[in-house]
Amino acid sequence: MKKVIFFTDFKKLHEALEHFDIQDFAGKKVPVKLHMGELKNKYFPRPDFVKQVVDELKKINADPYLFDTTVSYTGLRHSKTGYLKLAKIHGFTKKKIGCNVVIDDLGIPTTIEDREYEVAEHLADSTHIFAISHVKGHVATGMGGTIKNFGMGGVTKETKRRMHHGSRPVYLKD
């Protein structure tokens, strides 16, 4: 990662991307990693903002697609079909955004410091990734936007289960 840019004025997205070497994305398939929300929850990046990012990537001949992974708990995001339905409800469609929406539940086994993780196949196979994140806390990955977006959202359900299991409180009887 070359640079991290924080901004709040979405009208200045083009200017912000000028500070980021977006030309490196030209000619590449680019997963745009984001959380497309939960049912009845308004805290997720807005589709109109995401479309601006997709449009900027397309201007330089990148091939972007929206990307996320399924979750281990019950709900629409538990399956690819359910998550795609939820994405549509929240306005994340090819027609509205201008690119495909890909939900992954397959992983590539990856070992780091003697721990095995299943990294989402589309992320493991990518040379370039663009992340759009909202700030959120998580017991296993801490407070963060993009770090949490990849820490929990870039792995398979099985890896998520293992990470959550490791952070459960333990009751010790005296």
Give the positions of each predicted feature.
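N-terminal and secondary-structure boundary signal
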Residues: M1-D174
